[in-house]
């Protein structure tokens, strides 16, 4: 299975491990080690510990540089959305890491291969093994392929307000003028409705409604992001 994993990593990501034992350790659960007591095997927990720290650092550094206007609180929320069990388990599935985990028979029968917590652990342990084997640059190349493009796909929009996401999306290739114009104000005193239009370099992109001008602007930005991503 580890040989197959090596072939898969080489073919898919151009990754060639110098020390296959690190890769084997990263994809081995304790239950497998317990069922093979005479093979002197190691399981992933120590490497996972390292991988978690590496991911925290690299993701923190990336979003710090990418979002120079984002305050500390919003950076923290964005990092928390990117560096979490839900995200890592999805990345692991996308990378097909679930197919290469070495599990004990009991854990296999219990469906551990699809367990989010295990997939998260395996993703972290792989990063730890890659860092030990090949260093910072290899890890950065991998996460630039697997993690960071998800920012442009809207995976983490819930952690950053839509206006910030729209600004970052549009200004990657240079400055553009983004304006929010109030189109109408209606409803009742207890249930007001505001409608706002967002324009980019003078061109109308989308509108949004909300119970306040701020909420309407957020909705307009959200709709603009959805439209621009579909058109991309």
Curated annotation (Swiss-Prot):
Keywords from the named record: Cytoplasm, Endonuclease, Hydrolase, Magnesium, Metal-binding, mRNA processing, Nuclease, RNA-binding, rRNA processing, rRNA-binding, tRNA processing
Cofactor(s) needed: Mg(2+)
CDD domains for this protein: DSRM_RNAse_III_family, RIBOc
Keyword Aminoacyl-tRNA synthetase: no
Recorded GO MF terms: double-stranded RNA binding; metal ion binding; ribonuclease III activity; rRNA binding
Catalytic activity: Endonucleolytic cleavage to 5'-phosphomonoester
EC number(s) from the headed UniProt entry: 3.1.26.3
Pfam family, one: dsrm
Domain DRBM: 161-230
GO BP annotations listed: mRNA processing; regulation of gene expression; rRNA processing; tRNA processing
GO cellular-component term (any): cytoplasm
Residues annotated as binding Mg(2+): 48, 121, 124
Active site: 52, 124
Superkingdom of this protein's organism: Bacteria
Record localization: Cytoplasm
Every RNase III domain range: 6-135
Principal place of residence: cytoplasm
Quaternary data: Homodimer.
The protein's role, per its UniProt record: Digests double-stranded RNA. Involved in the processing of primary rRNA transcript to yield the immediate precursors to the large and small rRNAs (23S and 16S). Processes some mRNAs, and tRNAs when they are encoded in the rRNA operon. Processes pre-crRNA and tracrRNA of type II CRISPR loci if present in the organism.
Assigned protein family: Belongs to the ribonuclease III family.
Protein name: Ribonuclease 3
Organism: Limosilactobacillus fermentum (strain NBRC 3956 / LMG 18251) (Lactobacillus fermentum)
Gene that specifies this protein: rnc
